[in-house]
Swiss-Prot record:
Residues in the signal sequence: 1-26
Propeptide residue range(s): 114-135
Major subcellular site: membrane
GO molecular function terms noted in the UniProt entry: acetylcholine receptor binding; acetylcholine receptor inhibitor activity
Name of protein: Lymphocyte antigen 6B
Lipidation (GPI-anchor amidated glycine): G113
This protein's GO CC annotations: plasma membrane; side of membrane; synapse
Originating organism: Rattus norvegicus (Rat)
Keyword field: Cell membrane, Disulfide bond, Glycoprotein, GPI-anchor, Lipoprotein, Membrane, Signal
CDD domains with a match to the protein in the record: TFP_LU_ECD_Ly6A_like
Amino acid sequence: MNRSCAMKSCVLILLLALLCAERAQGLNCYNCTMIPFGNTCSSTATCPYPDGVCTIQVAEVVVSSVRLKVKSNLCLPGCPKSPQTPEVLGTVVHVNTDCCNTDLCNAAGPTGGSTWTMAGVLLFILGSVLLQTLL
C-alpha cells in the first residue's frame, strides 16, 4: 500500500511539473507584413520574445473614397491596445489587433467574438439562473 501511494505521488508530481513547465521552444506565429486583407499568410517564424504574443493587425484607411485594407501577422513582445487610430500624413488609419499565445494561433483576422465564447457565456448565464432558482 505504501509503495502504491508513493508511486501515485510521483506520477502526480511529474504531471504537475509538465503542466507548469515553460515551453522549451519559442512560440510559433504566422509572419507576414502588409498583405492584402483576405489573402492567407503561410510564412511562419519562432517568436524571439520570451513573453511574446502572436498578433494579427488589420489596418484600414480611406483615401479619396477608396478603402484600403491590409493585415500583418506578427510576433510582438506584448499585446498593443486595440483599436488604434494613428494619423499618417494627415490620414487617419484604423488598426484593430487580436493577440493570442498558442502556436500558429494568428491565422484568422479579428472578429467580433468566437462562437465558442458566445456559447460559454450563454452556458454561464443559464447555469447562474439555474443555481439561483435552486437556492
